[in-house]
Amino acid sequence: MKKLSFQQIILTLQNYWQDYGCAILQPYDAHVGAGTFHPATVLRCLGTKPWSVAYVQPSRRPGDSRYGMHPNRMQHYYQFQVILKPSPDNIQELYLKSLEYLGIDLKIHDIRFVEDDWESPTLGAAGLGWEVWCNGMEVSQFTYMQQIGGIECRPVAGEITYGLERLALYIQGVDEVRELDWNGQVGEKALKYGEVDFEAEWQFSKYNLELADSEMLLRHFKDSEDQCERLIKANLPMPAYDECLKASHAFNQLNALGVISVTERASYVLRVRHLARICCTKWLEMNK
């Protein structure tokens, strides 16, 4: 198997899905916990208009902060997201062909679809799903998106999320994310993943777990919550959704700090879900 660099894996997936007919979008410029939170998924999976896109999304999960010391868990990582709406009958076959396009021989590697129905409590989103395992390592999530913002997706969209770091660990045959070949160069031009991202990983872990100001984050959450409601009343669901994302990230930061009780956590989840629901509802009203 050819050992593609991290950036070659991204380019290969972009080329594959572009050839299929997907528009290649750019990452969303907001702090999100997963590629699913990009408005190209949350808003565009609603309604009847066909929508086929693919994009890389840098994602942040403050609760996964490990100061860069964990072999494959970070507070900042990358996903490659594909949305096909309506979901084609051969979506599983398309996914498997994308693995072959990456140089993974399906005849000699153990590819398994492990049932794992997906749910995002803060988005009010859910769907039938499977984790995709390659030789015992999870590399992707495969979901039939049935509901977002508490609204049924009609038609159902197919979502494929590649965990780029884990996929690269497998393709390159290394044990730690920091050792991944980033750019495929040799000598002075060679870059490893750790040289690109791990100083930031340590600093943001320090911030997320030790130095973030909980009182400030509580104010930010309430401010974003109020702004979202105000913008919905002004019929502006897209900037309102930005405020929903800000509230969601503030909640994740508070959760990472350990300053929210179990009861409070449930309340915050419901508050973010409400924001997502009103954004999705207003978007659908304006884009039928």
UniProtKB/Swiss-Prot annotation:
GO molecular function, one term: glycine-tRNA ligase activity
Reaction it catalyzes: tRNA(Gly) + glycine + ATP = glycyl-tRNA(Gly) + AMP + diphosphate
EC number assigned by the record: 6.1.1.14
Signal peptide as annotated in the record: none
Keyword presence, ATP-binding: yes
GO biological process: glycyl-tRNA aminoacylation
Pfam families given in the database record: tRNA-synt_2e
Cellular component terms (Gene Ontology): cytosol
Predominant subcellular localization, coarse grouping: cytoplasm
Coiled-coil residues: none
Keywords: Aminoacyl-tRNA synthetase, ATP-binding, Cytoplasm, Ligase, Nucleotide-binding, Protein biosynthesis
Keyword ATP-binding: yes
Entry-linked PROSITE patterns: AA_TRNA_LIGASE_II_GLYAB
Subcellular location: Cytoplasm
HAMAP family, per the entry: Gly_tRNA_synth_alpha
Family that this chain belongs to: Belongs to the class-II aminoacyl-tRNA synthetase family.
Quaternary structure note: Tetramer of two alpha and two beta subunits.
Protein name: Glycine--tRNA ligase alpha subunit
